[in-house]
């Protein structure tokens, strides 16, 4: 089958399978592609193709991830599946594969297991906003009461991590049966039911251009007779000439007006998400703006020094530390375009953190950075990346 051209006419949504090892994430992923392929809406990816996902490097971290795509009547989906538990942890923390929603796979024969819990917690911490559950291997459970019990357990676990456990759709089926082309209710119809649930329950994400304007400052220079220009790539939103922006981070927040937007040496009326622009700033001196600050829609983002984070610590094979670190560890935290020193407070009862661990921690920076929940950062020592993290909660 020829690769169909990417249809721009359907909304695009990023999803992924999460859950405990051997509960059937990869089998389900294969079954979805097979089912959609019968309708000409995907290319079938066999279990082995997905399981042998090539390793990718994201910010120096090795992550094995399989990417598949498929369409429903309503949408086009990009779907990620990871072979190993560590790959999931790294993926979710680095945001290498941003998920608008997740499909949590739970084996009905085993019920929720430790990684089920850990993946739900990670999803909560890193800001995966929505979840749909596929209760797999239902054909292996004869007792209806046992099945109801597992469903209840899953709902309670989701509620425990502040997901709406009572509302979340739970679809029962057998990924293996579906993959074998079984037409009984646990086979292909269960896949259709799951796709319907994902279509209706996971909302289409806001496009980057609809969000409030933000541009990390990469460089600053002055143009004689015109003023100060800050350059960078617009992360989100739109900036129009004549609009007011705030310069946030590192120094007290300053207000200014963008009097010109330049791209490829041409003057524009506006710059939008994805554009590399130069923004001409009224009334600011060259030394009042610096790399590491952001230009943002007034009131949309504030500077902070203290936050809770979810962090993955690189192994020495990934170029990370060879030794553990302890409470009070003081590395650099690289946010967007700059390094800021900060000190680490480990959770009560945690003595040290080993390379390869993932851990929740509190961080206090020595200078404030424009910050919000879900912001990604790297942990560095002398320019070398030793960890990756995401802001789980802003404290002050």
Swiss-Prot record:
Reaction equation(s) it catalyzes: GTP + H2O = GDP + phosphate + H(+)
Signal peptide annotation: none
EC number: 3.6.5.3
Origin superkingdom: Bacteria
Enzyme class: hydrolase
Domain tr-type G: start-end pairs: 10-206
Chain residues that bind GTP: 19-26, 81-85, 136-139
Gene3D superfamilies xref list: P-loop containing nucleotide triphosphate hydrolases, Translation factors
Major site of localization recorded for this protein: cytoplasm
GO annotation, cellular component aspect: cytosol
Cell compartment(s), UniProt: Cytoplasm
Keyword tRNA-binding among UniProt keywords: no
Binding site for Mg(2+): 26
InterPro entries for the chain: EF-Tu_GTP-bd, EF-Tu_GTPase, EFTu-like_2, EFTU_2, G_TR_CS, P-loop_NTPase, Small_GTP-bd, T_Tr_GTP-bd_dom
UniProt function note: GTP hydrolase that promotes the GTP-dependent binding of aminoacyl-tRNA to the A-site of ribosomes during protein biosynthesis.
NCBIfam families the record matches: EF-Tu (TIGR00485), PRK00049.1 (NF000766), PRK12735.1 (NF009372), PRK12736.1 (NF009373), small_GTP (TIGR00231)
Family indicated by similarity: Belongs to the TRAFAC class translation factor GTPase superfamily. Classic translation factor GTPase family. EF-Tu/EF-1A subfamily.
Subunit description: Monomer.
Protein name: Elongation factor Tu
Species this chain originates from: Anaeromyxobacter sp. (strain Fw109-5)
Biological classification of the source: Bacteria, Pseudomonadati, Myxococcota, Myxococcia, Myxococcales
């Amino acid at each position: 089958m020829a690769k169909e051209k990417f249809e721009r006419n359907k909304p695009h949504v990023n999803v992924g399978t999460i859950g405990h090892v051997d509960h059937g994430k990869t089998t389900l992923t294969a079954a979805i592609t097979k089912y959609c392929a019968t309708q000409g809406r995907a290319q079938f990816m066999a279990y082995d193709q997905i399981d042998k996902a090539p390793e990718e490097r994201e910010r120096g971290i090795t992550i094995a991830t399989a990417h598949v795509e498929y369409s429903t009547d309503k949408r086009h989906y990009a779907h990620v599946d990871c072979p190993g538990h560590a790959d999931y942890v790294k993926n979710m923390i680095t945001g290498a594969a941003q998920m608008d929603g997740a499909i949590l796979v739970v084996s009905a024969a085993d019920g929720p297991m430790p990684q089920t819990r850990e993946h739900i917690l990670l999803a909560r911490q890193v800001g995966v906003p929505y979840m749909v559950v596929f209760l797999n291997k239902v054909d292996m459970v004869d007792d209806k009461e046992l099945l109801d019990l597992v469903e209840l357990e899953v709902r309670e676990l989701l509620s425990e991590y502040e997901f709406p456990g009572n509302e979340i759709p739970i679809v029962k089926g057998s990924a293996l049966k579906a993959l074998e082309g079984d037409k009984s209710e646990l086979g292909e119809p269960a896949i259709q039911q799951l796709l319907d649930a994902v279509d209706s329950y996971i909302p289409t994400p806001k496009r980057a251009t609809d969000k409030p304007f933000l541009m990390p400052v990469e460089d600053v220079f002055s143009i004689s007779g015109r003023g100060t220009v800050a350059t960078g790539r617009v992360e989100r939103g739109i900036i129009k000439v004549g609009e007011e922006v705030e310069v946030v981070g590192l120094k007290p927040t300053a207000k200014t007006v963008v009097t010109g937007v330049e791209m490829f040496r041409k003057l524009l009326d506006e710059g939008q998400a994805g554009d590399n622009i130069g923004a001409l700033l009224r009334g600011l001196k060259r030394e009042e703006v610096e790399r590491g600050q952001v230009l943002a829609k007034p009131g949309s983002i504030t500077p902070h020094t203290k936050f809770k984070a979810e962090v993955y610590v690189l192994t020495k094979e990934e170029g990370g530390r060879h030794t553990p670190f302890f409470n009070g560890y003081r590395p650099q935290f690289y946010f967007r375009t700059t390094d800021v020193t900060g000190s680490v407070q480990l959770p009560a009862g945690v003595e040290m953190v080993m390379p390869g661990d993932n851990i929740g921690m509190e961080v206090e920076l020595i200078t404030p950075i424009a910050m919000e929940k879900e912001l990604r950062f790297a942990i560095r020592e002398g320019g070398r990346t030793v960890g990756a993290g995401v802001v789980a909660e802003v404290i002050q």
